From Swiss-Prot:
GO-annotated cellular components: cytoplasm
Assembly, per entry: Monomer.
GO molecular function terms listed in the Swiss-Prot or TrEMBL record: anion binding; guanyl ribonucleotide binding; ribonucleoside triphosphate phosphatase activity
Cystine bridges: none
Record-linked NCBIfam families: IMPACT_YIGZ, PRK11568.1
Gene expressing this chain: yigZ
A Pfam family that the UniProt record links to this protein: UPF0029
Species, as recorded: Escherichia coli (strain K12)
GO biological process: regulation of translational initiation
Stated name of the protein: IMPACT family member YigZ
Family: Belongs to the IMPACT family.
Amino acid sequence: MESWLIPAAPVTVVEEIKKSRFITMLAHTDGVEAAKAFVESVRAEHPDARHHCVAWVAGAPDDSQQLGFSDDGEPAGTAGKPMLAQLMGSGVGEITAVVVRYYGGILLGTGGLVKAYGGGVNQALRQLTTQRKTPLTEYTLQCEYHQLTGIEALLGQCDGKIINSDYQAFVLLRVALPAAKVAEFSAKLADFSRGSLQLLAIEE
């Protein structure tokens, strides 16, 4: 994906169902480790809750390698899975949902739990504000000092930026560009430098 929506700010929704209190929290989490860290922070904040059920889409919305969920002691399939289904249906990436349940003494049944956990995430998603994320690819570029201002201007025109500059006899730049803008920037760079400058891919 060239770009996707991510949460712009955290959301918390509180709901009481048959004396059980459900607190649904959504947050931006860039990667699985960030998702796990958010879950742990919620656990620390609500240590006395009976359940801390979890779902995350930790990468791009279509990245199945970064999905996760946990029922945390609720009957299998009644919490994490319906929560994840709501997240996946939203089209938002880099997002984690935690639903904290304080048990009120009345059993909700399988259908009731699915509705409570999935419904909590659905309500929170309706309140969520998002922003668009465009991932950038990094390249190196070597130029003369007098060319630097021109290159900065070209990067600005193509939604790119300079990540790092190393000043020696020449300037070695590490730049980042959206994938969709690389060809345009390369063409402008060739025109600007009369073919003397080119982007070099960074080898992993």
